[in-house]
């Protein structure tokens, strides 16, 4: 019988040895287990000390998209009413805003331009700096199924050799922070070879001439030098 994909593949973190199960307080160079009462008292005391010494706006609070609306509401109440600061943010904006901005500038909307079904039906999937098997088991299950049933090809670029890297047809390990370089070099190479859809680019993409000019420095030789990947790769 079928089970929920998240429940089937995304449960191991619950019993992970890396999971913190009790508050820890730093003593010297070590973290020592403490009670919740002691930990909360220490945090409250230190926050008040910082506030008294440096002012209200020396404090900042970051809430989480993994908590409920009510809990996020309480966090902003804590910041604004208890510590009298408007320095309150959410990890969703901090983490996802750059991606949303980039997508808006490139595809015209700050959201995914495709669907999980599109990825599953593709002939080739490229994963860059991510591990869907850990972070998005539903998507990973679709890729695994497409590999098994349709022979879908998978390329993974990462610093880590995780499960999806083990399953890949090609795993590349570029220097840290150079994914942009090799991806841009691949785009230039494809255009140089005439493998791009000229009609689509002409009708659906703005500033094509500027983009082509931007690609010029990104030769395969330049990418090899910057990323550590061979031209043959």
Identify what each model region corresponds to.
Residues 1-233:
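Catalytic alpha/large subunits of respiratory electron-transfer oxidoreductases
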């Amino acid at each position: 019988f079928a089970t929920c994909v998240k429940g089937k593949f995304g449960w191991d973190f619950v019993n992970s040895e890396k999971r913190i199960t009790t508050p820890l307080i730093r003593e010297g160079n070590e973290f020592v287990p403490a009670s919740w009462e002691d930990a909360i008292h220490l945090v409250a005391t230190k926050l008040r000390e910082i506030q008294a010494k440096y002012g209200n706006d020396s404090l900042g609070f970051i809430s989480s998209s993994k908590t409920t609306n009510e809990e996020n509401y309480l966090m902003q109440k804590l910041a604004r009413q208890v510590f009298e600061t408007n320095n309150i943010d959410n990890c969703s904006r901090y983490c996802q805003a750059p991606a949303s901005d980039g997508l808006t500038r490139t595809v015209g909307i700050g959201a995914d331009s495709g669907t999980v079904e599109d990825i599953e039906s593709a002939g080739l999937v490229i994963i860059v700096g991510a591990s869907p098997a850990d972070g998005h088991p539903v998507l990973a299950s679709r890729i695994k199924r497409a590999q098994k049933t349709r022979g879908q090809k998978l390329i993974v670029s990462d610093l880590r050799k995780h499960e999806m890297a083990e399953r890949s047809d090609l795993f590349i390990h570029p220097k840290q922070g150079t994914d942009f370089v090799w991806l841009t070099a691949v785009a230039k190479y494809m255009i140089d070879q005439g493998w791009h859809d000229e009609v689509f680019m002409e009708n659906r993409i703005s500033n094509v001439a500027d983009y082509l000019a931007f690609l010029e420095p990104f030769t395969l030789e330049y990418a090899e030098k910057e990323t550590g990947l061979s031209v043959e790769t």
